[in-house]
Each structure stands twice: as C-alpha cells, then as structure tokens.
C-alpha cells in the first residue's frame, strides 16, 4: 500500500531546521546583506530540503514593507552567496545546499478561501 503523503527523512528535517535558524539569525543581524533588506522585516515560513540535500527551498513572507515581492526576491538573490557562506559555517556537511527563495502564497490563498466562503 502506497503512502498518500510524502515524508521527509530525519536528515532533511534536521538540515531544514538548521537552515531556518541560520536564515533567521543572518536576517536579524543584517550584515553582508543587500541594503534593501535592512528595512524589510521577513518571516521565514518554511524550509524544504530536497532528498539529495543539495537544494533548500526557503519560503518567506514580508511584513509592512514598501518593497515589491520582485524587489525582495532580487535583494535576497543578491545576498545569496553571503547567506550560503553563513549557513556553510553552521552545518557540518561535505556540500552546502543551494538556497532558493520563494514567496509563500499560503496566506494569500487562505484569504481567498475565506472570501469565497464568506460569499456563499
């Protein structure tokens, strides 16, 4: 019998947790980051690591910012090398995963569903 949900290994979950903590720390410090991120509070909503541990998909949600999502994505991608170096120092692995940033549409989708249910 096949499982309906995809489970993540212990190593994936552990690495995702370490990356999440490191992202929070480097965003809080703000050193070596793109200057546009200084006045842009971000929440890291989740980190998903691929099964081969080579890619970490990091989902974020901005709060009270004048920047567009594209500007935030550009600033995060400009800071990707500094973030990856910081994470490399936190983990004890042969390879450091490639960090990929994604806007988390979960809250937008929840609002849309709430409006649809309200209209019923």
Curated annotation (Swiss-Prot):
Keywords on record: Cytoplasm, Ribosome biogenesis
GO biological process, one term: maturation of SSU-rRNA
GO molecular function: ribosomal small subunit binding
Compartment list: Cytoplasm
Domain of life of the native organism: Bacteria
InterPro entries: KH_dom-like_a/b, RbfA, RbfA_dom_sf, Ribosome-bd_factorA_CS
Family, as annotated: Belongs to the RbfA family.
Entry function: One of several proteins that assist in the late maturation steps of the functional core of the 30S ribosomal subunit. Associates with free 30S ribosomal subunits (but not with 30S subunits that are part of 70S ribosomes or polysomes). Required for efficient processing of 16S rRNA. May interact with the 5'-terminal helix region of 16S rRNA.
Subunit structure: Monomer. Binds 30S ribosomal subunits, but not 50S ribosomal subunits or 70S ribosomes.
Protein name: Ribosome-binding factor A
Organism: Rickettsia peacockii (strain Rustic)
Native organism taxonomy: Bacteria, Pseudomonadati, Pseudomonadota, Alphaproteobacteria, Rickettsiales
Gene that this polypeptide is encoded by: rbfA
């Amino acid at each position: 019998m096949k499982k309906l949900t995809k489970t993540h290994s212990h190593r994936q979950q552990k690495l995702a947790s370490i990356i999440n903590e490191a992202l929070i720390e480097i965003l809080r410090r703000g050193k070596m980051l793109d200057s546009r991120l200084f006045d842009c509070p971000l929440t890291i909503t989740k980190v998903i690591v691929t099964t081969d541990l080579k890619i970490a998909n990091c989902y974020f949600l901005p709060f009270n910012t004048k920047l567009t999502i594209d500007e935030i994505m550009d600033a995060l991608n400009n800071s990707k090398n500094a973030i990856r170096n910081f994470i490399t120092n936190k983990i004890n692995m042969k390879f450091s995963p490639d960090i990929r940033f994604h806007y988390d549409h979960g809250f937008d989708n929840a609002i849309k569903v709430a409006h649809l249910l309200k209209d019923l």
